[in-house]
Amino acid sequence: LKVGTSLTPTFRIRERLWEDSQWKVLNFIFCQRCGHPVPGKHSTCHVDLMSRHDGRSISYSGGWHDAGDLSQQTLQTGDVTFALLEAYNKQRNINPALAARLREEAEWGVEFILKNRYGDGYRASSMGLLIWQDGVFNTLDDISSVRVQNMAFDNFLYAGYEAYASMTLDNDPMLQEYLLRVAEEDFAF
């Protein structure tokens, strides 16, 4: 490539050009996992971070931390999960090892999306966070102020993510059926 007077060294454009980048991004995403031990990075975290709605509580650990801090957004988890599922579908017949890791990470995201549904249109949606917690309930660092919202457009997006996951994660008929059911419910909200 030549830009002005600058010239890059010669490089080859090859088949499967993006696989190295996909592995690196996938490993970074794994390191951002919340509620899961990441060897050499952190132990299980934020189990005692909770949302509350209608007399019920849900632990908000799961999904992935934001890259800049420890915050969480369920809708962003949906966006990342959808991208991982799309990449999985493209790689499943080309690079089975990469596809398996993409699928595993997408399943982690699906679990977080599903566990934060209250089933009445409301969902734990987000929390800005800058601290590590001890993971023990009823101690000084417990946080129960995770935002809970019922947003029609967000529910529409979740329905799409859940439906796509239902079509993609085809090795677990019970999960497929559940994803399809909640997609229909979320679409109606």
Regions found by a protein language model. Name each.
Residues V3, T81-A97, E111-K115, L157-M174, ...:
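Well-ordered alpha-helical scaffold segments within catalytic/enzyme domains
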Residues S6, Y88-E107, G121-Y122, V148-M151, ...:
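Structural helix-adjacent loops and short alpha-helical linkers that scaffold large soluble proteins
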Residues Q76, A83-L84, L102-E105, G109, ...:
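Alpha-helical packing segments of well-folded alpha/beta enzyme cores
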Residues S126-F156, G160-F189:
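Active-site cleft segment of glycoside hydrolase catalytic domains centered on the general acid/base Glu
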Residues R14-E19, N95-A99, R103, Y158:
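Acidic/aromatic-lined carbohydrate-recognition and catalytic surfaces
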Residues K2-D79, W108-R147:
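Low-complexity, Ser/Thr/Pro/Gly-enriched N-terminal "stalk/linker" regions
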